[in-house]
Amino acid sequence: MWNWFSPKGIVFGEGKAASTGLFARQWGRGRALVITGPFLRRSGVVEPVLQSLREAGLLGAVFSDIPSEPTDRHVREALGLFRRERCGTIVACGGGGPIDVAKAVSLLDANGGAVRDYAGVGRVPHPGVPIIAIPTTAGSGSEVSGTTIITEEAAHEKLLVISMYLVPEIAILDPLLTYGMPPALTAATGVDALTHAIESCVSRKATKLTIDFSLRAAGRLARFLPVAFASPDDAEARRECLLGSLEAGIAFTNSSVALVHGMARPLGAKFGIPHGVSNAVLLEAIMRFSLPGAPERYARLAEAMGAVPAGTPLETARAGFGIVSRLVRELHIPRLRDLLSREALDAQLDAMVREAVASGSPANNPRQASPEEIASL
């Protein structure tokens, strides 16, 4: 038995951001608070969204003080603006950060309290106001997921909230909005999407339907992410990476992520490492650790990413590990040892292991990891 969750509508194509006002009128509940990032506002990336809402008479306010790794403070500030301006719809335009804040604002407006009150799975009692999610990266997949990740400043802990009430009403994916991503951001968000594809494929909650989405996403991203990194204006690469991110987002929404994400969240929260980079530095090692739990699925992933089938599933899967390793190097993603010292890591290790286990994601891994094994990895 399984369930399937996704937005009520998914709109994909060049120039589709200009239709935001139309969808806000059809699916929203009044004026919209636009939540975005400072660079996106300064550079004009978000302007087609704003102009469309202006023309529809639905632009209420703009909150653009959102970093890539938002905290509960940003949520409180955005919620205050949402209420002061008496908005009834939220339009999130950006990477995972703005979309995560939009979900948290909708959550707290309807249910009160703090983000920590709802951390975990299925703890949100009531749905909030409609969200229209417009990603500018490829990507977090947050535009189609029922998750939000917010860092609690006081504890330096990433809080994961999972509820189908957080799935946006509409996802609008316009490849033109991704052209402004610098190469480093293309790499980090792209590996995040690839990790979604890989983990959703081998997750204990995966189904035949989600695995199909996972495999298509992995193949698409392995092929086109290096092209988008090297040639930011390549239209086909940008389009295919955004589509791969969408497919991976649909897959993990309905099958969950696993050990990589469980370990990456505390790594990012404690040391300020971008989420995609945290995934990247852990991905290959955890794939190798997890291989005995799902050799056939890892082999299918390897073939989807371009590996030539070898004599056994184990051999084919290991060829896939090589593809991932080369891709991470090609994208110039640093190693963990280049990001922090061993002493700094050891000082936070016990807390990070506890937070990883508490998130629930490691329980979905095809090979279960003990706290000691998580610390070793």
Language model region names:
Residues 200-326:
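Active-site segments that bind and position negatively charged phosphate/pyrophosphate groups
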Residues 17-20, 42-45, 72-74, 97-103, ...:
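Short glycine/serine/threonine-rich phosphate/pyrophosphate-binding segments
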Residues 41-116, 226-238:
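N-terminal small/polar loop signature for handling phosphorylated ligands or for N-terminal nucleophile
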Residues 18-33, 51-56, 84, 330:
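Glycine-rich phosphate/diphosphate-binding loops that line cofactor/substrate pockets in enzymes
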Residues 33-34, 89-91, 132:
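Conserved beta-strand elements of the Class I
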Residues 1-27:
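N-terminal amphipathic/basic leader segments beginning at the initiator methionine
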Residues 110-206, 297-300, 304:
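A glycine/threonine-rich phosphate-anchoring loop and its flanking beta-alpha core
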Residues 284-377:
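Mobile late-domain/C-terminal helix-loop "cap" segments
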